Regions:
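Short Pro/Gly-enriched coil loops immediately N-terminal to beta-strands
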Residues: 1-8, 13-17, 32-34, 112-120
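Hydrophobic hinge/microswitch elements
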Residues: 44-105
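Structured helix-beta-strand junction loops
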Residues: 35-36, 58, 80-81, 118-119
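A late-sequence structural motif
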Residues: 106-152
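Secondary-structure junction motif
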Residues: 10-13, 17-58, 131-139, 149, ...
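Conserved sugar-transfer catalytic core signal across GT-A, GT-B, and GT-C glycosyltransferases
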Residues: 29, 73, 119
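Short, well-ordered beta-strand segments
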Residues: 39, 85, 122-124
Length: 156
């Protein structure tokens, strides 16, 4: 998920910013942000590898102003209007609670729709084996947080 300070969207698109926000809510055009500053996780992190591959496939060279080891730091800097970052949607759902955003939120959240940026979280366990209370609770919490109420078949 590309996390963009609203001030950047306003600066780039001016009077069309509202229309562009709606359009980009189903997938962002990364090229529109070519000249804006980016704050990314340091290389060596799986998220950064995915982001770098995405940039490469789209022939996009970000104007990188800072690399950090902490995703929360990148998000805080985006909230402060310093730069654009890219965070895993799972992180945003569990840490930032994107569902409770309001019009006063200083950020725009634009999904990256490239299939290579989409991952599934899978919890596997053997049905014929004992699953601890903690294991059951983890699955229940994951389903609640991620909004998936249906139990997936696990079976290896």
């Amino acid at each position: 998920m590309m996390v963009v300070p609203k001030s950047f969207t306003d600066e780039i698109f001016g009077e069309r910013a509202g229309e562009i926000r709606e359009q980009f809510s189903s997938g962002a055009d990364i090229d529109s942000f070519q000249h804006m500053p980016f704050i990314l996780i340091k290389r060596g992190n799986r998220t950064r590898s995915t982001v770098d591959q995405y940039f490469s496939r789209h022939f996009f060279k970000p104007k990188l102003i800072l690399e950090t080891e902490n995703t929360i730091t990148t998000l805080a800097m985006a909230e402060a209007g310093i730069g654009i970052t890219i965070c895993p949607e799972l992180f945003l759902k569990t840490i930032h609670v994107t569902s409770s955003r309001s019009a006063s939120d200083p950020l725009d959240f634009f999904p990256l729709t490239d299939p290579s940026t989409i991952c599934k979280l899978v919890v596997g366990y053997r049905r014929d084996r004992y699953l601890s209370h903690f294991g059951e609770r983890f699955i229940q919490l994951a389903q609640n947080v991620l909004g998936t109420a249906e139990e997936q078949s696990a079976g290896a």
